[in-house]
Regions:
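Hydrophobic alpha-helical segments at protein termini of multi-pass membrane proteins
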Residues: 1-230
Length: 230
């Protein structure tokens, strides 16, 4: 029970933080709870697809090769998880009347990502200990939130394109809302999967740079928030 609480706390704290950054018009609590729940549920299809893809990759490449590490982390994990998190946010919020400001998209995608991260964290911590909970609270959960920030920017552009009747631009930016966070996610997971001293140095530098960038980007987007227009 104690570890479960530790596992949930960082995700909930970050949801509250991103909610407070929405300065113009707060999002309905019911909508955010729905998005969070959809994010939690998106773990199910993600796990199934990850298992299937892993088996497919192992048919063609050995598990101890760099090729497998790249394929598994970028496609078998990052692409699948970001797609599931984006769909969770889209199903819950895309047609909702509250989705009327650009920063709303970041709030929605971060909330979905943290729903996913929360249940993933619980599963990992049930198999680990307090050290696992602390490490994931400092690294893995914020990384999911950052993926949500990246996703949310492109998600918002796609929504505005739809309002303008530009289907081609909408489609392109919805794809980017998955592809761009996939890059960050894939680099993060790949660095953790490789066994080399310089990789660990790179990983921690990468985490620091991305964390600082994401914080500044959220502040900037919050300060420049505006109503979505056709």
């Amino acid at each position: 029970m104690f570890l479960t609480g530790w596992a949930l706390l960082p995700a909930i704290a970050l949801v509250v933080w991103i909610y407070r950054q929405d300065k113009v018009e707060k999002e309905p609590g019911g909508l955010l709870r729905k998005i969070f729940l959809f994010g939690v549920l998106s773990v199910i299809p993600a796990m199934i697809l990850e298992i299937i893809l892993d088996e497919v990759f192992l048919v063609f490449v050995d598990a101890d090769t760099l090729c497998y590490v790249i394929l598994d982390n970028f496609i078998g994990v990052a692409l699948i998880e970001e797609l599931c998190k984006m769909q969770a946010a889209k199903w819950a919020a895309w047609k909702h009347p509250a989705f009327n400001y650009k920063f709303d998209a970041i709030v929605y995608c971060v909330t979905s990502a943290l729903g996913f991260a929360a249940i993933e964290n619980v599963l990992y911590c049930l198999e680990g200990d307090i050290g696992t909970a602390v490490t994931r609270a400092l690294l893995s959960v914020p990384s999911h939130a950052i993926d949500g920030v990246i996703m949310g920017y492109f998600f918002g552009v796609a929504k505005e394109a739809e309002l303008a009747g530009n289907k081609k631009r909408r489609k392109r930016y919805l794809k980017l809302s998955v592809f761009m966070p996939m890059i960050e996610h894939g680099i993060y997971d790949s660095a953790l999967s490789l066994d080399a001293d310089w990789i660990f140095v790179f990983f921690f530098l990468f985490v620091i740079v991305v964390d600082v960038w994401a914080y500044k980007f959220v502040k900037k987007q919050s300060g420049q928030d505006r109503e979505l227009s056709a």
